[in-house]
Amino acid sequence: MSTDALSDSPLKIGSHTLTSRLLVGTGRYDTMEQMRDSLDASGTECVTVAVRRERLYERTGQNILDFIDSDRYILLPNTAGCYTAADAVRAANLGREILRTLGNPGSDWVKLEVLGDSKTLLPDPVETVAACEQLAADGFSVLCYTSDCPVTAQRLKKVGAAAVMPAGSPIGSGAGILNPANLQIILEYLKEDDEDYPVIIDAGVGTASDVSVAMELGADGVLLNTAIAHAREPVRMAHAMRMAVDAGRHAALAGRIPKRLYGTASSPQEGVISTRPYGSQADEIGS
């Protein structure tokens, strides 16, 4: 098989189809120019933007839309900073109106975040489920940030989430994938009756190997921000993340070999020049 034959199906979320499985945030960069260049290096097609009262903006007060090519990227408004379902619904509707004005196709979806704790930035499961149900009823394709709790993930899918996005670890922590077992359970449960249902790992990624691990577990994509924005060289890290998501995806599709306690020779044993005792014989010789 040639490398040209290693094709992959696109990632479908609601009405959107993406060939890149890396979704990238736009906050916390030193400069807007750095953000712009990092997005380009990442190869992403979808960028998340925080919604505020009057505009989509970054902490410097600059309008982020001046540095994002809305013809190139699908914008994904997010409700970052909301602590109640009501606030999240308001933010989502504001984002929808802004993107409709821009004519960007991202006006029909939203990344839902409803936080429950300002220190850990972990989500409030009750408010998240309530907001997801309301937004789905209002016609949004809802991508839900949640914890690694399989029960909450199931409830979000049941109330209409277009994608469930469990955290690898707390937002911005860089701690990586702390509970792979729970993520595997979430993947099993949510894909049981629909293997194409999108599960995207969101939050906690620290470096490229974390992205590969997430993809090797079977995730459909990874959403990240701080791991690029706070890297020593953000543009270089963005490029690393681009390669990592592809490497992890191909590894998942290819299938890893089983883990074994003992070694297994990769070279044929027939006709070897010398033999070496195994097991108890080796122990006797050693004594």
From Swiss-Prot:
A GO molecular-function annotation: thiazole synthase activity
UniProt record similarity statement: Belongs to the ThiG family.
EC number per UniProt: 2.8.1.10
Location of region: Disordered: 268-287
Binding residues annotated for 1-deoxy-D-xylulose 5-phosphate, in chain numbering: 172, 203-204, 225-226
Gene3D superfamilies associated with the record: Aldolase class I (3.20.20.70)
Alphabetized UniProt keyword annotations: Cytoplasm, Schiff base, Thiamine biosynthesis, Transferase
Function, as annotated: Catalyzes the rearrangement of 1-deoxy-D-xylulose 5-phosphate (DXP) to produce the thiazole phosphate moiety of thiamine. Sulfur is provided by the thiocarboxylate moiety of the carrier protein ThiS. In vitro, sulfur can be provided by H(2)S.
Subcellular locations according to the entry: Cytoplasm
Main location as per UniProt: cytoplasm
Subunit structure: Homotetramer. Forms heterodimers with either ThiH or ThiS.
GO process annotations (BP): thiamine biosynthetic process; thiamine diphosphate biosynthetic process
Location of the active site: 111 (schiff-base intermediate with dxp)
InterPro entries, sorted: Aldolase_TIM (IPR013785), Thiazole_synthase_ThiG (IPR033983), ThiG (IPR008867)
Reactions performed catalytically: [ThiS sulfur-carrier protein]-C-terminal-Gly-aminoethanethioate + 2-iminoacetate + 1-deoxy-D-xylulose 5-phosphate = [ThiS sulfur-carrier protein]-C-terminal Gly-Gly + 2-[(2R,5Z)-2-carboxy-4-methylthiazol-5(2H)-ylidene]ethyl phosphate + 2 H2O + H(+)
GO cellular component: 2-iminoacetate synthase complex; cytoplasm
Name of this chain's protein: Thiazole synthase
Annotated source species: Rhodopirellula baltica (strain DSM 10527 / NCIMB 13988 / SH1)
Gene: thiG
Annotated metabolic or biological route of this protein: Cofactor biosynthesis; thiamine diphosphate biosynthesis
Record-linked HAMAP family: ThiG
